[in-house]
Amino acid sequence: MSAGKAQIGKPAPEFQAKAVMPGGEFKDIKLADYRGKYVVFFFYPLDFTFVCPTEIIAFSDRAEEFRKINCELIAASVDSHFCHLAWTNTSRKEGGLGSMKIPLVADTKRTISQDYGVLKEDEGISFRGLFIIDDKGILRQITINDLPVGRSVDETLRLVQAFQHTDKFGEVCPAGWKPGSDTIKPDISKSKEYFSKQKA
């Protein structure tokens, strides 16, 4: 599968852009800065909208859970870094983000959105794209939602854990797999070990 220049199993498109960091400062960040860590890179349409703060706050509030498994979260939209800062300086009760634990990338030229295949050309905003990039910079997962529906932090965390498990042990993860659940050995005879435990 691919989206723009982003292809599963290939290096994720590199980017460099200004971001609002968790402390409120502006910083130029690039994907290469995160090599050696997993990255969940997700796009949202616009600041000061309706579904977007619920998603970003949900991810930010659980950033430590991702960091504990060597994974960083990065959010991006086509808004400027000044707009991002104003949104973080607006209280959550007023539709703002409040204090953030993750960087917000300003894709004002829309090149990152184009490279990742999430740009809604007619409106100049990003669809809700989410990309899981592994510690070697390889793209492992792509999800793109239409504008009205937000994403699940639980499912994103589960997917990162599953990819990390397969990377470490070489086994494959069945539907709904969670840490501690049985995996499948990718071998015709050895896989029967898993399937023999399933209900008839």
Curated annotation (Swiss-Prot):
Describe the reaction catalysed, as an equation: a hydroperoxide + [thioredoxin]-dithiol = an alcohol + [thioredoxin]-disulfide + H2O
Gene Ontology cellular component list: cytosol
Q: Could you mention a single GO BP entry for this protein?
A: leukocyte activation
Q: Which InterPro entries match?
A: AhpC/TSA, Peroxiredoxin, Peroxiredoxin_AhpC-typ, Peroxiredoxin_C, Thioredoxin-like_sf, Thioredoxin_domain
Q: Which residues form the active site?
A: 52
Q: Which residues form the Thioredoxin domain?
A: 6-165
Which domain of life, per UniProt? Eukaryota
Q: Which GO terms describe its molecular function?
A: thioredoxin peroxidase activity
Q: Pfam families recorded for this chain?
A: 1-cysPrx_C, AhpC-TSA
Q: What does this protein do?
A: Thiol-specific peroxidase that catalyzes the reduction of hydrogen peroxide and organic hydroperoxides to water and alcohols, respectively. Plays a role in cell protection against oxidative stress by detoxifying peroxides and as sensor of hydrogen peroxide-mediated signaling events.
The family note in this entry says: Belongs to the peroxiredoxin family. AhpC/Prx1 subfamily.
Spell out the protein name for this chain. Answer: Peroxiredoxin
